[in-house]
A protein has these predicted regions:
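Residue-level recognition of conserved structural "scaffold" positions that shape functional pockets
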Residues: 17-18, 199, 215
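Glycine-rich nucleotide phosphate-binding loop and flanking beta-alpha elements
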Residues: 125, 204-205
Length: 218
């Protein structure tokens, strides 16, 4: 039954969840909030939705780029390099991004009498991003259920698994990961050095899956 909305960025995690839950998804939503890599990731969201026959919309959130502070909004030069868990990667946090997106997706779900919103945060996100942690998802779910007539739930099926496990699941689903984007710099190819590139490389290696990504730094 197609009773769900999914937030899909065009990244590895959300594209995997898109395929994983395709039979239940009535609508996929992407957000253009001025992210450095938006021109790279958003077309992949559209591509995979078209491939699966899932309706897809992109909602502009230009106010975030104007008023929020994050290196993810300040151009490629602002993105720090190094492992995802390092202290300097906190600069890539877009404050309460997931809360804002989940609120909008919940309103759309309620408007269409859909019962849940999927988001693809995973276990590796918890270190840096407060709005990816299990306690946040639990609290947000309580708010959306209390604040909607149809009691829309927020579900994050990958919260307790690693990115490597997501890659393994996606490989089993036959996903073409060459058509996903992770790099926060948003250049022509993945830089290979920023936190998301490092994490992506490590995930494929740990999963024992061939990495189809082209990196500028090998």
């Amino acid at each position: 039954m197609k009773d769900s909305v999914i937030i899909v960025s065009g990244g590895l995690d959300s594209i995997t969840l898109l395929y994983d839950k395709a039979e239940t998804i009535a609508l996929a939503i992407s957000f253009d909030y001025g992210q450095n890599h938006g021109s790279k990731e958003l077309p992949y969201a559209q591509y995979h939705c078209e491939k699966l026959g899932i309706p897809h919309i992109t909602i502009p959130l230009s106010f975030m780029h104007e008023y929020f502070k994050s290196s993810l909004l300040d151009g490629a030069e602002a993105i720090p390099e190094g492992h995802y868990e390092e202290e300097n990667m906190k600069s890539t946090v877009v404050p309460f991004r997931n809360g804002i997106m989940l609120a909008i997706a919940t309103g759309i779900a309620e408007s269409h009498e859909l019962k849940r919103v999927y988001i693809a945060n995973h276990g590796g996100d918890h270190t840096i991003y407060p709005d990816c942690r299990p306690e946040f998802i639990h609290a947000m779910n309580g708010a959306t259920e209390a604040g909607t007539f149809v009691k829309v739930s927020v579900e994050a099926p990958y919260t307790k698994i690693t990115k490597a496990e997501i890659v393994a699941r996606g490989a089993a689903l036959g996903i073409d990961y060459a058509k996903t984007w992770s790099c926060y710099k948003g250049s022509d190819v993945h830089c290979g050095k920023c936190g998301t590139c490092v994490e992506r490389r490590e995930a494929f290696e740990a999963a024992g899956v061939k990495d189809p990504t082209v990196y500028s730094e090998d």
